[in-house]
Regions:
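N-terminal post-signal-peptidase region of extra-cytosolic proteins
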Residues: 33-51, 63-65, 82-93, 100-106, ...
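A short alpha-helix/helix-coil micro-patch that ends at or immediately precedes a cysteine
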Residues: 61-66, 154
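Short Gly/aromatic-enriched secondary-structure transition segments
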Residues: 67-83
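Exported/periplasmic cell-wall-interacting domains
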Residues: 94-252, 256-257
Length: 360
């Protein structure tokens, strides 16, 4: 039995109980009969791998699960009760931002003893966050409906999500979380094209496109302060790929099983994006001024919880976020973006991008 350790926002304690028999009942609860039936209908094994996908603006969390074909299919969508901060990645401790990016969840990040019923630590900061000088701690997917940098799901929903994650970790080392600001459509990217995070989001979209085009889990690496997806050694290369999160990216190619399908999706999206810009689609406000959001299904039950961000952030802290200076970088010729996702003529998908870092 894989140990599920106590590791969470509410204690960061060393594990005392590591066997399923000694864990609290809420952490060992079996999947419901309805969920087991759904798995059977979708041809998914109880302990097959999962991927969790989070869409902040829509306030939805999806659990995808590998079926008997070896590809991931959507199992279930859960409405998010509460997330805090604004659209955009976590930058520094105390900014109330919820993480965006790609995170690897190991058994030690499962917290059966959370004060918020059950919790899954997202593993922030990951190597990308560290390479870009971002910090924060104990950022979770948990129960309850309150958030300070976490995705709060309610106790009932986290019970099911936690159980699915627990079963998926039996016999394997980890599963992946993909956290996005919104569904990565051309329309949403066009609406948010003036955001200081637009370049970061376009980088996330590459990973999103790999998954949506293939329904296969992407391998994720970090080099040069950026994400790299499904990298393979170049043909006739004798050297193994080594990725330094802060160093220059090595020469690589993209897994050919993924590259062509992802490229087709990217090209179609690129054309749609260019047309939206040509039509002068309306631009969303860069910052909403509100502290996060929640799915509409919870608004009647929890009225008045979405307040101005200024009410919950200390003066001179997160309110400085819009004034942060971006750090420029340009893709090298061997990068995935240049090799497989070059912009179409006249498109607004630029290869020169900027990633925000906190002022120190």
């Amino acid at each position: 039995m894989i140990p599920l350790r106590s590791f969470g926002e509410d204690g960061n304690r060393a594990p005392e109980k590591t066997t399923r028999e000694l864990l609290p009942e809420k952490a060992t609860r079996d999947l419901s009969p309805d969920l087991l039936l759904l798995l059977q209908q979708k041809k998914m094994r109880k302990n097959s791998p999962i991927i969790i996908r989070i869409f902040k603006e829509e306030a939805e969390l999806e659990v995808w699960k590998e079926d008997t074909s070896g590809r991931f299919q959507l199992l279930k969508t859960y409405p998010i009760c509460r997330w805090s901060g604004d659209l955009g990645p976590k930058i520094y401790e105390g900014d109330r931002q919820t993480p965006e990016g790609f995170y690897t969840i190991t058994p030690r990040l499962m917290n059966p003893n959370s004060n918020y019923y059950l919790a899954i630590n997202m593993g922030f900061p990951n190597s990308f966050d560290k390479a870009n000088d971002r910090d924060g701690s104990f950022l979770m997917i948990h129960g309850n409906c309150g958030s300070r940098g976490c995705y709060a799901m309610t106790d009932e929903q986290i019970s099911e999500i936690y159980s699915l994650a627990r079963e998926a970790l039996l016999g394997r080392p980890s599963f992946q979380i993909q956290a996005y600001p919104f569904r990565m459509t051309p329309a949403n990217l066009a609406r948010h094209r003036t955001s200081p995070h637009a370049a970061f989001w376009k980088m996330l979209k590459i990973g999103n496109d790999h998954f949506e085009a293939t329904h296969l889990e992407s391998t994720v690496a970090v080099c040069g302060g950026r994400y790299v997806f499904d990298a393979w050694e170049p043909p006739n290369s004798s050297a193994s790929l080594v990725f330094d999160p802060k160093g220059q990216c090595p020469a690589f190619v993209t897994n050919p099983k993924i590259a062509q399908l992802a490229l087709q999706k990217q090209r179609a999206d690129d054309l749609e994006y260019a047309q939206l810009i040509k039509n002068n689609v309306a631009v969303a406000p860069i910052y909403s001024g509100l502290d996060g959001g929640m799915n509409e299904v919870f608004r009647a039950k929890f009225p008045g919880v979405i307040v101005p961000l200024a009410m919950v952030l200390p003066p001179g802290s997160g309110l400085e976020l819009p004034r942060m200076s971006p750090v420029p970088w340009t893709d090298d010729v061997s990068s995935l973006a240049n090799r497989f996702f070059g912009a179409l003529p006249g498109s607004n998908y630029a290869l020169e991008t900027h990633i925000a870092r906190p002022a120190r």
